[in-house]
Regions:
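Short helix-initiation/N-cap motifs at beta->coil->alpha
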Residues: 75-92, 135, 173-184, 188, ...
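Ligand-binding cleft/hinge of the Venus flytrap
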Residues: 48-51, 63-78, 156-175, 205-210
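Short loop->beta-strand "edge-of-pocket" segments that line small-molecule binding or catalytic clefts
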Residues: 34-41, 55, 141-157
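Extracytoplasmic small-molecule ligand-binding "clamshell" domains
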Residues: 22-102
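Flexible hinge/capping segments at coil-to-helix
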Residues: 26, 131-148
Length: 294
């Protein structure tokens, strides 16, 4: 089980090398005059409206970061380009320089930090399961010998395999290409449960044709800290991103952005998530750090 964020330290723990030691991302931005932001279809964090315009909680934060980059690099004409990724392609897109920031619902964990870097977490979720409301399933042991779907290339895949091994649940695990695909399998009766980050499950349920037909059940399997992702070993660029996240926190802007997306109706269907900021996120923002415990 992933533990809650630990070892909170003062903002000084984010001290990084001076911008003069800037890495490849800054050079790439100067050369192309463009910052490329990777976005996913994971409402309310990152998605597109009916006009295919990107929006969401993570997108708003990344746009603030983009303005800080523009100001720090003295590039008022810098363009912002959006690039669509999914749970599978988000890492390769970053490592192959197709995107400079990934702004969605990506979990910051030790395994991923071997290849990429993250800034300060802007959300914490927990893994639970979406089931049909009339299924009778209330907790994980009731998934024994059943078909379970989750989305490929997510942290939930390993989590379920580990749970299957340790608890001998004998579940048949299948993988959807996207969260929407995984939800559809439960909706159509092709899978009995869809374990995933609870906030994404609540969003998918709220957007469905019959929200009351689904329930979100199970004790939390893990805590998932979401962070903006960028390339590893690029301290100059990371310093700008971290500094802007710190500003958003200390100026209380992040709280206003959170309320916009989680406590008020959001487009395109004016759905209200009705999710006040949880204790874990609120507490972590008191002592912001990019260091999370796994």
């Amino acid at each position: 089980m992933r533990k809650a964020i630990g070892g909170m330290t003062a903002m000084m723990c984010l001290a990084l090398p001076l911008l003069a030691q800037a890495g490849d991302t800054i050079g790439k931005i100067r050369k192309t005059q463009t910052l490329v932001i990777g976005i996913r279809e994971t409402a309310p964090f990152s998605y597109t409206d009916e006009n295919k315009q990107p929006l969401g909680y993570s997108v708003d934060l990344c746009l603030k970061v983009a303005e800080a980059i523009k100001k720090e690099l003295k590039m008022p004409a810098m363009k912002i380009q959006f690039y669509s990724v999914d749970s599978t392609t988000r890492f390769s897109a970053l490592l192959e320089d197709k995107i400079d920031l990934e702004c969605g619902s990506t979990t910051n964990n030790a395994e991923r930090r071997k290849k990429v870097a993250f800034t300060i977490p802007h959300f914490f979720s927990s893994v639970r399961a979406l089931v049909k409301a009339d299924s009778g399933i209330k907790n994980w042991p009731q998934l024994r010998n059943r078909t379970v779907v989750t989305t490929k290339s997510t942290t939930t895949v390993k989590l379920l395999n580990d749970r299957n091994d340790t608890s001998s649940l004998n579940i048949k695990l299948v993988e959807g290409n996207s969260d929407q695909d995984s939800f559809k399998m439960v909706e159509e009766g092709k899978a009995d449960a869809f374990p995933m980050d609870d906030v994404l499950l609540y969003s998918l349920r709220a957007e469905s044709k019959a929200p009351a037909s689904f329930a979100i059940v199970g004790d939390p399997l893990s805590i998932e800290p979401y962070s903006i992702m960028m390339r590893k070993d690029d301290p100059g660029f990371k310093k700008i991103v971290d500094s802007e996240m710190l500003r958003l926190i200390h100026d209380n802007e992040i709280y206003r952005i959170y309320e916009k997306w989680f406590t008020k109706p959001i487009p395109p269907k004016n759905i209200n998530m009705n999710m006040s900021m949880g204790f874990l996120l609120r507490d972590s923002l008191r002592f912001p750090t990019d260091q999370v415990a796994d």
